[in-house]
């Protein structure tokens, strides 16, 4: 519940900020371009990228329970400031605070999962899928709620969101205990220094996972904010032939996002329950193929203004199916990262903090590339850039699969029959 409410607030702020920036000139601020949206989104993930290893190490030293409570405090401060200003520099600073919110909480939660699922790959698959599901459900619900709340409350909705952050803090404070005592404890007073952190990373296999995970997150990052901005801004005469750039209302965008989030959520649950029967890399490969099918169908829809309605409905089938399959790549990659933390029981928080690092790098690349692509070619640019990122993600899978065989021998004996 803590992850759900925290991510709800994160998604709500992110989407409402897009609506706010799209009409910032009406509130006395400047006009905002696609590039500005990209920079703001990148700032959020840059903060998460830079601060996650630090907070992961602090969680290993001081306890997961204590450190995760900083997240909602940073988030509440950010949304209050967002509702009070139209200054782009201050709004950019609030994106850093929001990123710090995620950086403080996520490594602590993932360290908890890594300890709680020791020696049980079935439980680990379900746990990481549920973490991703809670993350997606929270972000999705926040993004979907942003349209109605912005329509009803406008800037006052940011202050309401601060209350939700307060609820998240209360859940972490009173509803979560540090798991290390229940598992024999790895409590230690040794500081996880930068040198120690680099030593851990040099001995782990995480760098083989990094290219695929970064590219997948870049593909997702292309759409996290740019798509909303492209959908809701007024029609651009340069892209009059693109059906998806007709200037939709926030309520319509929220409805479409709700359907997409439900499909993605269902995919997370389905593929997370396949860890015992299928290799992580196999699930990731299927996900990348599903993403490519989604892009191809979306291109046809975007240029299908003259197509009969029945043909458009048929094209929605590979969009929905591709999204469902693509969803499996996220818990599979997270499961691999948890497997790689097994040899480092005292440093799980630091290693699992790489989840946010890789996510942050991918989202920064995706956000900036998406801003440039959308500014140049609209939705077509986003779709082409997505296909490029998916192609990059599939390239390292062969080497990653070899590492997975080694992990099977080390921590999952008897798993060699997996497909």
Regions found by a protein language model. Name each.
Residues 66-81, 282-298:
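Structural signature of the two symmetry-related core transmembrane helices
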Residues 28-43, 126, 130, 237-261, ...:
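Loop-to-transmembrane helix entry
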Residues 44-53, 139-140, 261-269, 363-364:
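Residue-level signature of mid-helix packing/kink "hotspots" within the transmembrane helices
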Residues 4, 89-104, 309-328:
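Hydrophobic core of transmembrane alpha-helices in multi-pass small-molecule transporters
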Residues 177-211, 414-419:
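Juxtamembrane intracellular "pre-TM" segments in multi-pass secondary transporters
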Residues 49-86:
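Conserved MFS/SLC helix-loop-helix module at the cytosolic interface between two early adjacent transmembrane helices
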Residues 94-135:
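Cytoplasmic helix-loop-helix junction between adjacent transmembrane helices
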Residues 50-63, 266-280, 374:
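Helix-to-loop junctions at the C-terminal end of transmembrane segments
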């Amino acid at each position: 519940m803590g992850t759900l409410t925290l991510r709800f607030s994160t998604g709500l702020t992110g989407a409402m900020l897009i609506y706010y920036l799209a009409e910032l000139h009406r509130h006395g601020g400047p006009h905002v371009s696609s590039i500005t949206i990209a920079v703001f989104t990148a700032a959020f993930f840059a903060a998460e990228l830079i601060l996650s290893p630090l907070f992961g190490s602090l969680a290993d030293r001081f306890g997961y329970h204590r450190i995760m409570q900083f997240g909602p405090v940073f988030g509440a401060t950010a949304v209050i400031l967002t509702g009070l200003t139209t200054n782009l520099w201050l709004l950019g600073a609030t994106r850093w605070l929001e990123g710090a919110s995620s950086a403080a909480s996520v490594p602590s939660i993932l360290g908890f999962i890594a300890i709680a699922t020791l020696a049980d790959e079935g439980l680990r698959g379900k746990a990481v899928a549920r973490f991703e599901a809670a993350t997606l459900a929270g972000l999705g619900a926040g993004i979907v709620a942003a349209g109605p709340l912005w329509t009803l409350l406008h800037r006052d909705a940011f202050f309401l969101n601060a209350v939700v952050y307060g609820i998240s803090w209360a859940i972490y404070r009173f509803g979560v205990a540090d798991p290390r005592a229940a598992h024999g404890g790895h409590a230690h007073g040794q500081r996880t220094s930068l040198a120690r952190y680099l030593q851990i990373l040099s001995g782990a296999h995480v760098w083989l996972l990094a290219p695929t995970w970064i590219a997948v997150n870049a593909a997702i990052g292309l759409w996290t904010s740019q798509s909303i901005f492209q959908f809701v801004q007024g029609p651009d005469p340069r892209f009059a032939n693109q059906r998806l750039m007709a200037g939709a209302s926030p309520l319509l965008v929220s409805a479409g996002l709700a359907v997409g989030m439900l499909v993605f959520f269902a995919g997370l649950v389905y593929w997370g329950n396949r860890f015992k029967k299928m290799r992580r890399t196999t699930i990731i490969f299927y996900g990348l193929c599903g993403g490519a099918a989604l892009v191809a169908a979306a291109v046809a829809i975007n240029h299908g203004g003259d197509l009969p309605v029945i043909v458009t409905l048929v094209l929605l089938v590979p969009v929905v199916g591709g999204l469902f399959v693509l969803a499996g790549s996220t818990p599979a990659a997270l499961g691999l990262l948890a497997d790689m933390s097994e040899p480092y029981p005292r440093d799980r928080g630091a290693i699992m903090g790489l989840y946010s690092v890789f996510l942050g790098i991918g989202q920064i690349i995706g956000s900036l590339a998406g801003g440039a692509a959308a500014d140049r070619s609209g939705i077509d640019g986003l779709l082409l850039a997505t296909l490029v990122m998916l192609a990059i993600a599939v390239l390292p899978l062969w080497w990653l699969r070899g590492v997975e065989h080694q992990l099977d021998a080390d921590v999952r004996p008897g798993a060699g029959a997996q497909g």
